[in-house]
Amino acid sequence: MESIVLIGFMGAGKTTIGQSLANKLKMPHLDLDTALIEKIGRSIPDYFEKYGEAAFREQETQLLKELSKNTAVLSTGGGIVVGPENRSLLKSFQQVIYLHATPEELLKRITEDTENQRPLAIERSSKEIITLFESRKNFYEECAKMTIDTTNRSPEEIINEILQQLKE
């Protein structure tokens, strides 16, 4: 089976769904953010603070290139679609799944997730986060071969829909 790439805004469920989907398909799961932390040797918020978003996006692009050689379920960071080079890379995969949720649902998940510090959500208002989502939405849609709505759905329901659509 070819790689499956999960894209979507922060809080869409990419890591949660990626891990479970990989288990179901008996494939390795690669989380781009986790791999980036290992590569850069510090947390993403620390890296953002010290080097800025542009430097972070460069690291992200390099890692996406490296990981694209593996066959796995790949959970990406929410901003992976920002760079044109990344969008080209994403379009080269056969299975790119956009995990979509309403802005209200995303805000709820982001604010309730105390374990995950999201540098682009810290110290931003709800309105600013929604504006950020809206600025990326078309890029997610442009890169996706499949869109799955995750709003008010359990991980199991989402995975079952993905598996059903992969069979078709």
From Swiss-Prot:
Does the keyword Nuclease feature in the UniProt annotation?
Answer: no
- Give the EC number(s) listed in the UniProt record: 2.7.1.71
Which Pfam families does the entry mention? SKI
> Which reactions is this enzyme annotated as catalysing?
shikimate + ATP = 3-phosphoshikimate + ADP + H(+)
GO CC, sorted alphabetically, is: cytosol
Binding-site residues for substrate, renumbered to this chain: 33, 57, 78, 136
On the tree of life, the source organism's domain of life is Bacteria
Sequence positions that bind ATP: 11-16, 118, 153
Q: Cofactor binding mode, per the note? A: Binds 1 Mg(2+) ion per subunit.
Localization: Cytoplasm
What are the GO MF terms of this UniProt record? ATP binding; magnesium ion binding; shikimate kinase activity
Pathway-wise, it operates in: Metabolic intermediate biosynthesis; chorismate biosynthesis; chorismate from D-erythrose 4-phosphate and phosphoenolpyruvate: step 5/7
| Function (record text) | Catalyzes the specific phosphorylation of the 3-hydroxyl group of shikimic acid using ATP as a cosubstrate.
Q: Assembly and interactions? A: Monomer.
- Which HAMAP family would you find in this protein's record? Shikimate_kinase (MF_00109)
Q: What is the protein's name according to its record?
A: Shikimate kinase
